[in-house]
Amino acid sequence: MATVVADMSVSLDGFVAEADGGVERVFAWYGKPQPESQPREGRCEPGASGLRVIVAGRRTFEQAEGWGGKHPTGALVIVVTHGIPEGWPREGAAVSFVTEGIETAMKQAAAIAGDGVIALATPSIIQQCLNLGLVDRIQVKVVPLLLGAGIPMFGKLTGDPIELENPTVVEGNGVTHLHYRVPDQRRAA
């Protein structure tokens, strides 16, 4: 069974991007040398441990210009969207599109991932999956930055508050990694 991981870089005040969608400052740590103790799977690097599928939204897909048809990690990308962009799908691209909603996308991701990792790569996808009880772990990369406004990571959660287990904390250069396990009672069977 796949492990579903919500994985995002965020400002200290909880924003994944500036109000205009800019992410340069939130992701500036990616260009800095990191200590050996930094978890590879948390950085979504090529060869990251067990990463098989990334589920993203249309906005992220467009901002990344479709990753040129292949995500840098080598993982398959499933884009949840209301409509398939013009010129897609492309032959040989490791990007597919789901127009039937998040539940269909997650079923497809699970079938592809097997016992590997499914990374959730956008706030709206993370929020929808948390609301459905589909998330096993939350990995946030907190950068020492206060944006004051922007796109929040957890802006539209529904239901009861989610109490997470104690985090694993890994200090990096310009980033602190916080890895939380979502308790079993919050996950769908």
Where are these regions (language model features)?
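Enzymes that bind and transform nitrogen-containing heteroaromatic metabolites
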Residues: 1-189
